[in-house]
Amino acid sequence: MKCNKKQEIIGENLMRDKIVLIDGHSILNRAFYGVPDLTNSEGLHTNAVYGFLNIMFKILDEEKPEYLTVTFDVHAPTFRHEMFADYKGTRKPMAEELRQQVPVIKDVLRAMHIEVIEKAGLEADDLLGTLSHRCEEKGMDVSIISGDRDTLQLATEHIKIRIPKTKQGKTEVEDYYAADVQERYGVTPKEFIDVKALMGDTADNIPGVPGV
């Protein structure tokens, strides 16, 4: 999606275009558990869709980007499963009330002419990583909206990670540039990768180094 906003010139410097990248499944999941159950007249659950759109509109109002893209996971094995067969092996199946809302939010986004990207063999955050760095290389400012703190490894001077939290229908957002990651965790974004590798990740069933 390209938003209707003209580039402006301040002094001799051309303002950088801005793109917002949203981790679709991550934000939909957070909205589902953060917003009370809602259904339409046909009995379709809509709380995740409602919460997702609230978060998205809040971010768009704050950021006023020229571009917006939403990435989604594809329900298929990824290259990580080839490297480690038990990857996400202990994760519970997605709640049916949430699953039925995934195609709905995609349809809503496409109806709004918002670009939706998904690719078999890759996860949404893989796409976020590629897109964010390519956009940065083209001189753009990037805001990544995700509930997954693994995305903190992507933070730079021009790539901001925004982690929303929804409680009782209200959304608050934590912002992280590279300097913020260093201040909060005592490591750089690149070093954050090593920390995660050493610690492991119970959510993804990835074992860490014993005793760490």
Place the predicted regions along the sequence by residue:
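Extended two-metal-dependent nuclease catalytic cores across DNA- and RNA-processing enzymes
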Residues: 10, 16-17, 36-39, 89-212
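Non-catalytic, usually N-terminal nucleic-acid engagement modules in DNA/RNA processing proteins
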Residues: 10-69, 73, 79-84
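Membrane-targeting and insertion segments and their boundary/processing signals
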Residues: 22, 26-30, 72-79, 83, ...
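A short beta-strand-to-loop transition that corresponds to the Sensor-1 phosphate-sensing loop
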Residues: 24-25, 71-74, 146-149, 165
